[in-house]
């Protein structure tokens, strides 16, 4: 009966069915023709794997190998890669970074690339509001020294509450502890003292990152043509929406209260800066400002806590590093009257090198400098990059290139410390010490953890200070090692171009005697 009914509908509406079929056919033909025209100048990696769907699945399970193989095979040329994106994705070698960096935002858009990667069409996270970068660049970075004492106060409280006071070796899920610690100290900067210690706030801030990641992964697993039809049904996306509502319900009353306050009475934090910046960057509704805050939590808490976990896993696997790092901390603090400040943290060169080497071998992303192409342009080698394409730079492959980093797969904690000490004679006869270019927060063509150019991560200075503060206090108070029976550093988990430390693993720690 159902078949007969369907047949009758087709007969009765034959002209509608024919028109729809023609439109769909035309759209498919145009899409295929655009794809053919746009990729005729771009060789693809992984073609031996077979169909586009097989290549997409290979990207989800082993993007690292695809980026590495493409980087080695094409080296100085652009190549295509089939990813989870609905758009053509081209991978650009670092030699083109300067010329790409000179292109205006009307040609290459960082925010639209972020929207693509975060599946914003379906997640509705709206993490590309320009007020975010304005507030971080214009207020946060300039305020770090001023907020240093407040951050340290929250850190001390969090460490005393969350880390065990153990005289014997004790197993700890350090990933869970670090997520909460980072949420507390970042929260002091983002939402101020009234919220940063609140269980409701911390629960919302920590879990929004988990649920956003799960939703993006779940959507990305679907073939692109199925996403418009099936994404809304995904339980991960529903969980994200519910969590977004909870975050907004926590932030909304605080925002309403802040708006009613006199400007001079408002606390010195990101909430206030965003409210104040509306004069320059346009009015936002309370709902939009809550979404902006949510975006900040996604960007800051998840990534920083993962970097911290990677650092702790490295220390647990290589406890022989601890005495040298601890001695540097002791020496530097003695020289700065025992004060942990931005200045004293910057003086801890070996600790800085350890973090940079951690990020080199265990970056949060396998690709960097993502940009959406808004207008077709031609590179200096003649390769045409079409409008609509998504650009990536194979950062992890670059950072493990033996031509750039000797013995690149070996973790050398003081690799960048040694480079900082090297002196180079410049053309004018002056001496240059390679300090700044090899600092953890520095971004250059060979070190792309924080991106590159004018859109490099504006929050990297806060992240660096937080990571160093956590390690300074921990290393002065605790010993650390892997679990008994474990002899190698825990492997990271990877999906597509995302890489995270395994959050289920435990390490052992005990109070320093």
UniProtKB/Swiss-Prot annotation:
Lineage: Eukaryota, Fungi, Dikarya, Ascomycota, Pezizomycotina
Magnesium found in the keyword field: no
Enzyme type, top EC level: oxidoreductase
Gene Ontology biological process terms in this record: secondary metabolic process
Main function: Cytochrome P450 monooxygenase; part of the core atranone cluster (CAC) which products are predicted to catalyze most or all steps of mycotoxin atranone synthesis, starting from geranylgeranyl pyrophosphate (GGPP). The initial cyclization of GGPP to dolabellane is probably performed by the terpene cyclase ATR13. The Baeyer-Villiger oxidation near the end of the atranone synthesis, which converts atranones D and E to atranones F and G is predicted to be catalyzed by the monooxygenase ATR8. Of the CAC's other predicted gene products, the reducing PKS ATR6 might synthesize a polyketide chain.
Cofactor: heme
Protein family membership: Belongs to the cytochrome P450 family.
Alphabetized GO MF terms: heme binding; iron ion binding; monooxygenase activity; oxidoreductase activity, acting on paired donors, with incorporation or reduction of molecular oxygen
DNA damage recorded as keyword: no
Name this protein carries in UniProt: Cytochrome P450 monooxygenase ATR2
Signal peptide residue numbers: 1-19
Glycosylation sites: 37, 139, 173
Catalytic activity, EC: 1.-.-.-
Pathway given in the UniProt record: Mycotoxin biosynthesis
Assigned keywords, A-Z: Glycoprotein, Heme, Iron, Metal-binding, Monooxygenase, Oxidoreductase, Signal
């Amino acid at each position: 009966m159902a078949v007969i009914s369907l047949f009758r509908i087709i007969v009765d509406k034959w002209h509608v069915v024919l028109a729809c079929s023609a439109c769909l056919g035309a759209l498919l033909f145009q899409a295929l023709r655009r794809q053919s025209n746009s990729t005729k100048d771009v060789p693809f990696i992984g073609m031996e794997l077979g169909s586009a769907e097989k290549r997409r699945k290979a990207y989800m399970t082993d993007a690292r190998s695809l980026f590495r193989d493409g980087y080695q095979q094409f080296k100085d040329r652009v190549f295509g890669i089939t990813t989870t994106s609905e758009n053509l994705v081209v991978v650009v070698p670092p030699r083109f970074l300067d010329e790409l960096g000179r292109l205006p935002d009307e040609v290459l858009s960082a925010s639209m690339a972020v929207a693509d990667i975060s599946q914003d069409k379906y997640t509705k996270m709206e993490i590309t509001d320009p007020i975010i970068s304005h507030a971080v660049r214009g207020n946060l970075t300039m305020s770090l020294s001023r907020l240093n004492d407040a951050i340290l106060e929250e850190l001390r409280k969090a460490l005393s509450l969350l880390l065990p006071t153990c005289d014997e070796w004790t197993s700890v899920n350090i990933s869970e502890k670090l997520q909460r610690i980072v949420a507390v100290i970042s929260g002091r900067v983002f939402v101020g003292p009234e919220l940063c210690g609140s269980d409701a706030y911390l629960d919302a801030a920590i879990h929004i990152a988990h649920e956003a990641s799960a939703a993006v992964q779940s959507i990305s697993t679907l073939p692109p043509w199925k996403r418009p039809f099936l994404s809304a049904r995904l339980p991960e996306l529903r969980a994200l929406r519910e969590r977004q509502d909870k975050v907004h319900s926590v932030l909304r009353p605080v925002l309403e209260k802040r708006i009613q306050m006199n400007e001079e009475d408002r606390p010195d934090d990101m909430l206030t800066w965003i409210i104040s910046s509306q004069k320059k960057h346009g009015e936002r509704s309370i709902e939009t400002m809550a979404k902006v805050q949510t975006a900040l939590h996604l960007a800051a808490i998840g990534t920083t806590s993962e970097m911290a976990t990677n650092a702790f896993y490295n220390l647990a696997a290589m406890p022989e590093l601890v005495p040298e790092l601890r001695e540097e901390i002791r020496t530097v603090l003695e020289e700065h009257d025992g004060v942990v400040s931005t200045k004293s943290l910057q003086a801890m060169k070996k600790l800085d090198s350890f973090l940079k080497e951690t990020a080199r071998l265990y970056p949060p992303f396998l690709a960097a400098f993502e940009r959406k192409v808004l207008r077709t342009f031609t590179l200096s080698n003649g390769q045409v990059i079409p409008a609509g394409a998504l650009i990536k730079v194979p950062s992890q492959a670059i950072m493990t290139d033996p031509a750039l980093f000797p013995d690149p797969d070996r973790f050398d904690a003081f690799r960048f410390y040694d480079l900082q000490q090297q002196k180079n004679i410049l053309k004018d006869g002056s001496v240059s010490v390679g300090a700044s270019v090899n600092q953890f927060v520095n971004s250059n063509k060979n070190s792309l953890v924080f991106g590159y150019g004018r859109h490099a991560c504006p929050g990297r200075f806060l992240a660096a200070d937080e990571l160093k503060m956590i390690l300074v206090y921990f290393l002065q108070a605790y010993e650390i090692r892997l679990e008994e029976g474990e002899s190698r550093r825990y492997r990271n988990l990877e999906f597509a171009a995302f890489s995270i430390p395994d959050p289920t693993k435990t390490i052992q720690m005990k109070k320093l005697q």
